[in-house]
Amino acid sequence: MKITYHKLKMPLISPFTTSFGTDINKDVYVFKLEHNGITAYSESVTDENPFYGSEDNYTVFHIVKQYLAPVVKGLPEPDEFNEQVKFIKGNNMAKASMEMLLYDYYAKANKKSLVDYIGHSRGYANVGISLGMDDINVTLKKIQEALDRGYKRIKVKIMKGKEIGILSAVRDNFPDIVLSADANSDYTEKDFDLIEKIDRYNLVYLEQPLYHDDIIYHSRLAKELSTPLCLDESITSPEKAQKAFEMGACKVINIKEGRLGGIGNSLKVMGIVKEFKGHVWIGGMLETGIGRSFNVSMASLSDINYPGDTSPNDKYFKNDIVKNPFTMENGTIKPNKGTGIGVEISEEYLKKYTVEEGIIA
């Protein structure tokens, strides 16, 4: 058994801007497990800075090498792994990178695709697009291009002071599209009056307007809005999802497997959303074709009832590290049919983008 890593620096096709910064590259750790003729892959959704959450590439590598990889070497099944690493507080993205590595391994060991190993897939994922902040005219052009390609939901990034202009322009030009907005926790409880102005734009939901770890203020804001709230950063466990619905803090949850600690916790959150008759979708973190394959598989599950941020690979990368990138047809993407996550790695581009590599365990 061997666990290795590649740290990659992959240039994005265009800069991606949110309320907390602009990405021009995707800096990512890709992990590989080799055992008994099976090769499994995963990646970490962190980057170089702890701006989305508290983890970054440096913390993930430390936690994986010192604590998680030794557990993975025992080849526990994913649920067993989650139980065995409970003693480690937080560090969900590190945990997810190893849990999902085990999911790929065991799906392949059982000669099943990941979706068949998990179960309850409808066979396709409905696709939405997330657009970073940009010049208004550029954004309008990107929206038209996305609609022409068949995307089923448009999401625009906003921040305090730059929300009314973009939302007004989008609604003036596209009055009937399925539209959402994501603030990435840029507002505070002092901004309720400003946020309430967003109601006029008929959004399907407003995503994470307040603090990244908050439920209480979101529950208060929800009472003032007709627009449903979607929580992203705040939902780091099934327990927090339960509390959020009980307190009325949201009607929608954006699931990111990395943020929740892996597929197991993500499935639990789906069950909670279903119990409360809410809505749920699969988000994205500018993943490579490896992480994107996990996302598409999850987004195809029958309990997912909103389009997710599961764009084809060419949305972000000119050349991905997989030879079989996803393509979209009529606003849907089908999971890979091969065993596990079903990706074929391009050794050419893996080598081209690698800035560091080595053995972890």
Place the predicted regions along the sequence by residue.
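Flexible C-terminal active-site loop/helix
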Residues: 1-12, 23, 28, 36, ...
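Predominant activation on well-ordered alpha-helical scaffold segments within soluble catalytic domains
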Residues: 65-69, 99-104, 168-171, 196, ...
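Hydrophobic faces of well-ordered beta-strands that scaffold small-molecule active sites
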Residues: 42, 125-131, 152-156, 179-183, ...
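Metal- or metallocofactor-binding catalytic centers and their adjacent structured scaffolds
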Residues: 5, 34, 39-109
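Shared catalytic-loop signature of beta/alpha-barrel
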Residues: 213-230, 235-332
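Conserved, mostly hydrophobic/aromatic
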Residues: 31, 37, 98, 111, ...
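Short, P/G- and charge-enriched loop/turn segments at secondary-structure junctions
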Residues: 15-20
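Metal-dependent enolase-superfamily TIM-barrel catalytic cores that perform enediolate-based chemistry
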Residues: 116-225
